Amino acid sequence: MKKNSLYNTSTISLVQYLFAIAVILVHSGRLTSYEPVHFALKSILGRMAVPFFIVCASFFLKQSLRDSRKMKAYLIKIIKTYLFWSCVYLPYAWLFFSSLNLPAYLFPAGVLIALVYLGMCYQLWYIPAFLLGLLLVNQLVKRLGMLWTGLITLLLYCWGLIETYSAYLDTTSLLKGYQLYSNLFFTARNGLFYTPIFIFMGYYLYDHFHSQNFRVHRWQKLAVAFGFLCIEGVVIFQHEGMDKNFFFLLPFVTVYLVNACLRTSFLKTYDLQYLKQMSMALYFSHPIFIEWARYGFSNLPLSYPDRGKLMFVVALLGSHLFGLVMLSYHNWQKERKNRSSNKEGL
């Protein structure tokens, strides 16, 4: 993410870093026995992380749509990153597959499904879902325009809302239809139903960044949208559904949050690019430390909340240590490249 005098990318990097920590919190399991706090942390705060990542990425990608070279370079970079981490988590995928007691000859098919759909580990679903959503939204925008793309992505997102509101839809044909779907495809949190609306929101924000809707009263609009999201959370908390990946107000809260971060003067003069890189290190590496802690502490006589807190601390420290090593390596590579360039210049 390059510095731009128009956009506050420093605050974006900071919030991405904080949301990466929120993802670790979600994957660490239960941190408290008090249900309302557990729900707020895991189902509201934690669920805002990936949408924020998607809206930010698509906002900055929108300007590259007409530059095929930039888009190609971005896609190659993200695919290389995804394939690298898929190889890292291949042993984890094998252990998970083995726990299902399925024949070994089905493992290649399982790897293929994981690679193109579910992810080799529970945080990697985001990349194939983002890429599929990007392809879908780009084709819709190209063929139908932004208005129809917005309506279609919203309708697709509403299909996923069925899992969140399933307790209110008991015995309805909608729920029966969704159950048939989930038996085949496991989840609607994918590149067809989940990511397109957030990609569209990023595109929409880029196109209308200078409109009055996003310029005026931005923090007030964010506060109102977040307040309604909390009310929606209370409704869902009363009767929790099959899963809680989809909140109706989440796309609107996310786009107003990204807009507010891009416009604020807070930290704008600081270079916090390293926090963006650190957030990527945390996001991709934290399951390694969570699973080590889960195995290492399995025999300790701890309650679920205490075990969750311990795993969170271990994963937080371990992934930060990995991030520092990664940043040091990248800086060393950059300095080495600069020295080589200077020698060639001489």
How would you label these PLM feature ranges?
Residues 1-346:
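Alpha-helical transmembrane segments and their immediate juxtamembrane cytosolic regions
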